[in-house]
Amino acid sequence: MSLLPTATISDIARHNGRVVTLAGWVAHKTEKGKLVFIRLRDGSGVMQCVVFRKNVAEETFIAAQRLTLESSCRITGTVRADERAPGGFELDVNGIEIIQIAPEYPIQPKEHGVEFLMEHRHLWVRSSKQHALLRIRAEIIAAAQEWLNAQGFVRFDTPILTPCAAEGTTNLFATPYFDLGTAYLGQTGQLYVEAGMMSFGKVYCFGPTFRAEKSKTRRHLTEFWMIEPEVAFALHDDNLALQEQFVSAIVQRVLERRADDLATLERDTKPLERCVPPFPRITYDEALRLIAERYAEVEGCTPLEWGEDLGAPHETLIASMFDRPVFVERFPSAIKAFYMEPDPNRPEVALCADLLAPEGYGEIIGGSQRIHDAALLERRIREYGLNVDDYRWYIDLRRYGSVPHSGFGMGIERATAWIGGTHHIRETIPFPRMLYRMYP
C-alpha cells in the first residue's frame, strides 16, 4: 500500500482525460447544493476538484462535506480541461480518502496583523503568496549555484563556528566553546573561502551568516543566507563584471521559470526585464554629490559628509536615478572591512563596491578586491584594533604564493525581496530571526 499520488498538479495537463489520484490539503471549499468545490493544493500547484452528488457514492459526498480548511486527503477523479478553472483543468471526483480532518484553522481568509501571522509562521508559509515567495527564493539559490558551477566554480564549505570576527567586533554572537574559550557565529564565510580560492582558483561558499545588529529595519535579519564567490587573479573591474553577469543570469532564470509565482505576488516584471549588463557605476564621491543635490526627494535622506556611510534612504535615492542595479564603488577605507585592497592611486579609498537594487530595495551585494600583501594586511588588522594572533592563518595565505584576488557576497533574502517585490525581508526566509523575533 502507498499513499503517494499518481500525479502532481504541476504536470496535470499531460493527464487530461485520465483517472488520477492527487494527495494534498484543502485550500478552499465551497458547497452549492448537490455540488462541492474543493481547491486542493499539493505543493506543486492548486487544482479545483468537483464533487457532484449524483455521480459519486454517498460516502464520498459526505467525505467532501466533512473536509475543512487544511484537512489532508487523497482525491481520485478524471482530469478534464476547463478554461474557467484555475490552471485550465479540474478534477471530476469519484473518490475521497480523508487522512485528517483539521480543526478550525487559525489563519482564515480575512485580514490578519503581521504579529499574528509571524506567531503562526509555521502555518503562514502555506499561504499562496508566502509559498510563491519561498519558491522564488529556492529558484534564486538553485540558479546562483548552477550558474557558478557552470562557470567552473567549486563549492567550498566554511565553518559556522569561528574563533574571531570577520566583519567587525560589535555585532558578534558569542558562545562558550569547551576549554578553548569563546566561539562566534560566523558573520561571513569569506576569510575561509579565500583559503579555498588558493586551492581551486574559483570557489564559492553558501550558508547562514549571523549579525547581532540591533536593527529593526525592513532590510535586516540577525540570521540570513549568503552566497560568496571568490576568484584568484581577479581585479576590481573583473569582480564587478562577474557580479553583473551573475545577477542578470539569476533574474532571467526566475523570469523564465517562476512566472506564475511572480504573477501570484503581482510583481511588475518590467524592472526585472531591464536587469541586463552592463550596470551603471558611480563612485562614492559621485554618490555624495548626487545626494547633496537631490536629498529632498526621499524622506529621511540628508546630505552626507565624506567618510559617512550610505544609509537606506541614500541607497533608495541613488537607485531611483537608474533603471537597473547600480554599483557604488570606491568607498572610504575607514568605513569598510580591514581586508579590502586600497586604491593604488588614492589609498584612502578601497577597491570595493556595493550593488544597489532598484525600486528601493537597497544593497544586495557587497564586494571588493582583497589585500594580497601580508605586511599591509597585518598593519590593517592592527589599525582596526583586532588581535593579530587570531588572524595568523589568514595572513599566512599571503605568504605562500599570494595573488591579487576578489570576491563578493550576495544576501539571498535581500535578493529575494527585490526579485519577488516584497516590502519586508522577514517574508523571504521560512523562519526569520530578528531583533524581537525568535519564535517559532
From Swiss-Prot:
Top EC class for this record: ligase
Asked whether the UniProt record includes Aminoacyl-tRNA synthetase among its keywords, one would answer yes
Localization, UniProt: Cytoplasm
User: Sorted alphabetically, which InterPro entries does this protein's record hold?
Assistant: Aa-tRNA-synt_II, aa-tRNA-synth_II, aa-tRNA-synth_II/BPL/LPL, Asn-tRNA-ligase, Asp/Asn-tRNA-synth_IIb, NA-bd_OB-fold, NA-bd_OB_tRNA
What is catalyzed by this enzyme?
tRNA(Asn) + L-asparagine + ATP = L-asparaginyl-tRNA(Asn) + AMP + diphosphate + H(+)
**Which E.C. number(s) belong to this protein?**
6.1.1.22
Looking up HAMAP family in the UniProt record yields: Asn_tRNA_synth
- Official protein name in the record: Asparagine--tRNA ligase
Recorded hits in PROSITE patterns, A to Z, give: AA_TRNA_LIGASE_II
Chief localisation class: cytoplasm
The answer to whether UniProt assigns keyword Acetylation to this entry is no
